[in-house]
């Protein structure tokens, strides 16, 4: 049951949030390209993006929730 729920969550995230993941990818790349200290390996980045997308999706893509998730992934982003 838990595995099925996880697969359903993953599918809805992938369907709904592919563009959001691209945006997060781009923002993180911009923030970390000149700062090796803040670079995350690809697997960590993907896990964080998936969590952020699930969180945003569950909150109906609310603008403030999106900003909060982006700041969580890349706290260097200026408002």
Swiss-Prot record:
One of its GO terms (cellular component) is host cell mitochondrion. Signal peptide: none annotated. The keyword Methyltransferase does not apply. It is found in: Host cytoplasm; Host mitochondrion. Its main location: host cell. It comes from the Viruses. Keywords: Host cytoplasm, Host mitochondrion. InterPro entries: Rotavirus_NSP6. Transmembrane segments: none annotated. The keyword Cell cycle does not apply. Interacts with NSP2 and NSP5. HAMAP family: ROTA_NSP6. Belongs to the rotavirus A NSP6 family. This is Non-structural protein 6. It comes from Rotavirus A (strain RVA/Rabbit/United States/ALA/XXXX/G3P11[14]).
